[in-house]
């Protein structure tokens, strides 16, 4: 058995516990990455995210200009007022301490927002929300490629990158 973060994976015929996952699709470039939920670390926040992904959700990305290899995405706000809360998980992170492949979820004003960390960040501030998932090891290289594509869309093309986030199968 191999342990990676708080998750275990199948090795040489052993069986891993059932792990729910999310898929982040990038239709513009025909790519996607899968991330396993960290339900043991952030059970409440993972459950909120899972519930909000009953239907696939379109989101618009934005990439920081100078602080590192991370991008965030926001869904369209709801048409009607929603009950809002703090939306912070059990664990606190600085941008500099989110693990490679970390997916952060923050519940604010309806669906909230996701961030994907595909490399190091230099911003020494606390993130909003908490890490709820981690990109599977086999998709880390794809995560770096899609991160660069989000950067290119924003910085070079000046066109938004739209993603679709859904429950994994």
Residue ranges, per PLM feature:
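Glycine-rich active-site loops that engage anionic ligands at enzyme catalytic sites
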Residues: 27, 37-169
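N-terminal intrinsically disordered, low-complexity, charge/repeat-rich segments that act as generic
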Residues: 2-41
